[in-house]
Regions:
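Short, charged, surface-exposed hinge/linker loops at domain edges
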Residues: 1-9, 38-73
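A short, exposed loop/beta-hairpin motif centered on an aromatic-Gly-Thr core
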Residues: 28-39
Length: 73
């Protein structure tokens, strides 16, 4: 099975003030907030891709869950 952004587990929660948070456990520090569940998911997915791109730019390895997103054919 191919890895896709949808198959990377995202933890979700809602703060007392109503904001939603989303976190990707395999990428420490990748957490985002949004006014809705969907907005938080979208924000954390975009952040995860930015962090992965930065890791690649600096010659570092991306988490194994993201490897197939960037592997050559």
């Amino acid at each position: 099975m191919e890895t896709s952004p949808e198959s990377i587990p995202i933890a979700l929660g809602q703060e007392d003030d109503g904001r939603w948070w989303a976190d990707i456990d395999c990428m420490p520090g990748v957490m985002a907030y949004g006014p809705t569940r969907e907005a938080a998911i979208s924000a954390v997915r975009a952040l995860a891709l930015r962090v992965a791109a930065d890791l690649i730019d600096h010659g570092e390895n991306v988490p194994p869950q993201l490897e197939k997103l960037f592997s050559a054919a």
